[in-house]
Amino acid sequence: MTRDGATARIGTADLHLHTLASDGTAGVVEILEHVEANTALDVVAITDHDRIDAAVAARAIARDRGLRAEVIVGEEVSTLGGHLLALFVEERIRPLRTLSATIAEVHDAGGIAIPAHPLVPYPLCAQGWVLRGLLDRSDERFHPDALETFNPTMLGRPWHTRVVRFADENGLAAVGNSDAHALGAIGAGWTEFPGRTAADLRAAIATRETIFRGSFHGTSGQVRTFGRQLAKYGRDAKAGAAGRIRRDGSGRDLGYPPEPAADLADEARP
């Protein structure tokens, strides 16, 4: 309840979406149109691997078109200690450094840091002993802001209960995300929070007022997505061999116009 007795509005967010810019299978405009037409999400974050250009474009397009869902610029950063969701960033966060240094850089850039699909015994995932070491440090610059406690993929499902318990025991906000690499997966995991804006979501993470929701994918759906990814990799390889994709990634069709809105900036380049 709010102070005047009214029922607080609960917003929904999916903070882990991939586009054609990394290993997703849908373009930016496709994703935005799908979110608008087929979900009730208030906030989404585009979090391609180690780049933010598509996320910056998505935010610009959403604002230009007046779409319902607010777009957060994010990045799934490849660190030496596992994948990390960097949200509310305006410049690319450098990959392939320690998890602690990456979290500190995200905070210094004004963002928040959330380990993706954590605790899974796999090199792409932050391990519990590493996270405890960070949380034990006196400098909060090295502390993660939340944990991705719900990830509906085969990577997240077996360890879900353990991650929820870890977040609770260590005083971390819990968020649910889809880790979507295909349109149909968007919203399979989500976060509920008081309010409806990205600012409301950020405040809720800071005060641990978030709740994760979602349903796990079946094996057949995961296999279909993997097949789409393989087809996408094949197209990229063919285009690269033909010289249409340069080393910086430019030339790849990311599913949005070259200049969708005025606030696309040079720093969004990978």
Question: Where in this protein do the model-derived segments appear?
Answer:
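Charged catalytic cores and adjacent phosphate/nucleic-acid-binding surfaces used
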Residues: 1-15, 19-37, 41, 53-59, ...
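Flexible loop residues that form catalytic
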Residues: 49, 118, 152
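Hydrophobic/aromatic-rich structural module bridging two neighboring secondary-structure elements via a short loop
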Residues: 69-75
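Aromatic-lined carbohydrate-recognition surfaces of secreted/lumenal glycan-active proteins
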Residues: 114-124
